[in-house]
Amino acid sequence: MADAEDIQPLVCDNGTGMVKAGLAGDDAPRAVFPSIVGRPRHTXVVVGMGQKDAYVGDEAQVQRGILTLKYPIEHGIVSNWDDMEKIWHHTFYNELRVAPEEHPVLLTEAPLNPKYNREKMXRVMFETFGAPAVCVAVLAVLSLYASGRTTGIVLDSGDGVSHTVPIYEGYALPHAILRLDLAGRDLTDFLMKILTQRGYSFTTSAQRGIVRDMKEKLAYIALDCEQELETSETSSSVEKSYELPDGQVITIGAERFGCPGVLYQPSMVGMEASGIHETTYNSIMKCDVDIRKDLYGNIVLSGGTTMFPSIADRMSKEISALAPSSMKIKVVAPSERKFGVWIGGSILASLSTFQQMWIXKAEYDESGPSIVHKKCF
């Protein structure tokens, strides 16, 4: 094996909705594909097609008509390990075209990831893929590093789950982490429901993809919902049209801000939960009184569901209303926040000081899977 210094570590951020993977030192992930595994509904539908027993990512998406699609990651946590192995195999061999036994691998995990899951990740990497070294890092810590900070509170909202994670000098504070099972997929579902009530039919997974695209292109956060509603009723400035693949044009107005508004008011989708602003505030209040000032001044947004226009302004407004009046509040929405976790991983894995964080194969063989709790962070 070549000298460890010459070999770029692999960075793999496994999200509920998308896998982001690439080589450490790059400024963006080389591979971004849906975290799905599809299996044929009927065996050998077409004779002589040389059908595979499973399809992963975009390939599964394209052939979804004949497949049953499964998401191996639910709410940020791996729930189906066989399918997860298929996703990793696809990531290394088909997307990145690298040999995992030649590169250290940095994996991300959800905050509050069960201990068993963390051990299992390392076991699969060492025993199935033969990785020379592995590190498992909490995704929110990586987002914070990507924004150039070591202390702050990260609101990470992806496709399947949102978390607020207070971090002090590089360490997440587990007692104050809060999880909210409300994220991008719920917003897409809500928009599908509104459109269905308006007489459009969006039911299949293919149509769900169209609605997700509509959400990503047209939705925005209203600074003041009441005000925005009045505007949308009296003028057409809020209305935008969207062309469906079949040429039909849909016009959406109030739905543009109503859909992501659910993040601040989960009761709109029947959830008895606090909105993202209140969850962030509650998370800060669980921390020691001496560090709250540092957290209020460094609220960092990360993940695809924080990409809505005006989200930082609204967040700032809502938290100012909850916090002590003299408190200085700063909400940071880095432009690259969609891939913030991956970028943080890329930065971290390229640092020479990071060498002591890796678990080498020899250490794993000696101590077994529980070593992941001693090293990594």
UniProtKB/Swiss-Prot annotation:
GO CC, one annotated term: actin cytoskeleton
Alphabetical UniProt keywords: ATP-binding, Cytoplasm, Cytoskeleton, Hydrolase, Nucleotide-binding
Location relative to the cell: Cytoplasm, Cytoskeleton
Pfam families for this protein: Actin
Record's keyword annotation contains Transferase: no
Primary site of residence: cytoplasm
Catalysed reaction equations from the record: ATP + H2O = ADP + phosphate + H(+)
InterPro entries: Actin (IPR004000), Actin/actin-like_CS (IPR020902), Actin_CS (IPR004001), ATPase_NBD (IPR043129)
SMART domains in alphabetical order: ACTIN
PROSITE patterns, sorted: ACTINS_1, ACTINS_2, ACTINS_ACT_LIKE
Family to which this protein belongs: Belongs to the actin family.
Role according to the record: Actins are highly conserved proteins that are involved in various types of cell motility and are ubiquitously expressed in all eukaryotic cells.
Other notes: There are at least 16 actin genes in soybean.
Protein's recorded name: Actin-1
UniProt source species: Glycine max (Soybean)
